[in-house]
A protein has these predicted regions:
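Anionic-ligand binding patches
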Residues: 1-123
Length: 123
């Protein structure tokens, strides 16, 4: 979240202290954004494919999924910050998306598709 200088960042699973406490993590995120108008947020995924541990030319794929953070949790699908991650282009939170749609749109889905495309070009 740029307004929070990149937090929660790589600590997203343990942002509120205990690893995997989605409710506490979301509560802390919303509290820290209280009074902040700029609520842009994004998820980022970086993947690397190596043929072996010393591979000098790994295949890299990255992707970001942009949205905004909303105060009220909406939806029950997904996990983590999904209920508060609002997608303006769809008019809904990522927790309202069916898994098949989320898997295509998300940062992980996009990075995976890019990696598969790069691997296919090698064949």
């Amino acid at each position: 979240v740029p307004a929070l200088h990149g937090a929660p960042g790589i600590y997203s699973a343990r942002y509120a202290g205990r690893h995997g406490d989605d409710t506490a993590n979301n509560r802390k995120l919303v509290a820290e954004l209280r009074g902040i108008e700029q609520r842009h947020a994004y998820f980022y995924c970086a993947m690397a494919f190596l043929l072996h541990a010393e591979d000098p030319t790994p295949i890299l794929a990255t992707a970001a999924w942009h949205g905004t953070i909303v105060d009220q949790a909406v939806g029950n699908n997904g996990f983590g910050y999904d209920p508060h991650f609002f997608l303006p282009e769809l008019g809904k939170s990522s927790a309202l998306l069916p898994a098949t749609v989320k898997n295509q749109m998300s940062h992980r889905g996009q990075a995976t598709a890019k990696l598969i495309d790069q691997l296919a070009q090698l064949a």
